[in-house]
Each structure stands twice: as structure tokens, then as C-alpha cells.
Amino acid sequence: MVNYPALGPSGHSATWKSVDGAHESTVSLQWENEGWTANGTLGADNAQFVIRMSATWMVQQFLLFRDLEEPDLWLATDGHGRWGEMNGAHRTELDGCVDIDLRGTPFTNVIPIRRLPLLVGHSAQQNVITIDIETLAVVVKPQMYTRIDEHTWRYFSFALDCDVEVTVDEHGFVTDEPNSFIRVTESVVGIANDWLGLLLHRPKKSL
């Protein structure tokens, strides 16, 4: 079952603004090498991320950039629940996880929303890799996703004992996350040829 229509090969982009208007979060999605590459910014943390996903929105790699041209954190999975760093270190505490969660962007919730084959009223629980941008701490937290209706999802954090209902568009992209973000722009973007090239040509931080 497919929840939302497939995105076109020309890609997709979105910008969200924090409800206080102080920060923006962006994502640009490109189709390449039989999968999706998401390049995003975290305005509140002055950081950038890259998430490499399969055609079915399964996370394969995650890169986080803060102050350096090289990634501060680079995680990858073999597609069977085993996680490690790109230097070869096996992160056993992450094994079995499927998704990445970043506090500073609604996009990491778009990934399970588009991937999970849920009917209205159904739920799915899974362990999520939660990353603290400031400290680079990586913690596994259980979350539950429930599809309320065609354009509304609820996700519940067992660790925080709280839930959030978000509104999504026809593509499953978050348009409104109460008390956190509201989407201000959405557009189709051009095709990128090489995802590593995106890393090399990602926008430089201003001093």
C-alpha cells in the first residue's frame, strides 16, 4: 500500500519557519542513483544535514555538518537494522532502528509518514535514532505514529510522554506542527546528478 503519490524525478523542496519566526529549516530532495537524497538546514542550530534514502524511503545514511567541511557525524545502516559510523565502528546500541529524528526540522517526521503503510486509525511503533545537534549525543527512543485521517498524523514520544498532531499535504509533507513549525514555501526542484557532489557544493556558512 502507498500512502501518498510518488514524487517526480525532478525532486521536491520545502521551507519551514519556527512559530516564533526566529529560525528557518529547509530541505531539498533529489532523486539519484535509485534513491532519494535530502539536503537540509537547521537554522536554530546553524547546522546542515544530508539523509540518503532508498526509493521506499528507508534511511541508508545520515551526515551532520556543523562547523567543519567534513561531517561531524556520519552514520550508515546495512538495510537490515545494523548501524555503524563510516569509519567502521559498529554502533550496537542503534541496531534495529529505522529512522532518524532531528528536533530542528519537521522533515525527519515526513520520512516515516511517507513510508509507513498505515490506514486511517492505525498505528506503528518503532525505535528512532534521536540526535542532539549541540553535543552529538545519539539516543534511541521509541515513538508511535498514528494516521488520524488523510492529512493528519500523530506521533507519540514514550520518552517524553507527549504527543504531537501534525497536518500534512497531498505528498505527506508537514505543513503545520503546532507550537513548533509552519511551512512557508514548497516547490519542485531540479535534478542533481551526484549526491556526493551536493556535499562538496553545499552552501558555505557565513562567518
How would you describe each model-predicted region?
Residues 158-207:
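C-terminal structured interaction module
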Residues 6-51:
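N-terminal ordered "arm"
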Residues 40-44, 64-68, 87-90, 156-162, ...:
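Secondary-structure transition/turn motif
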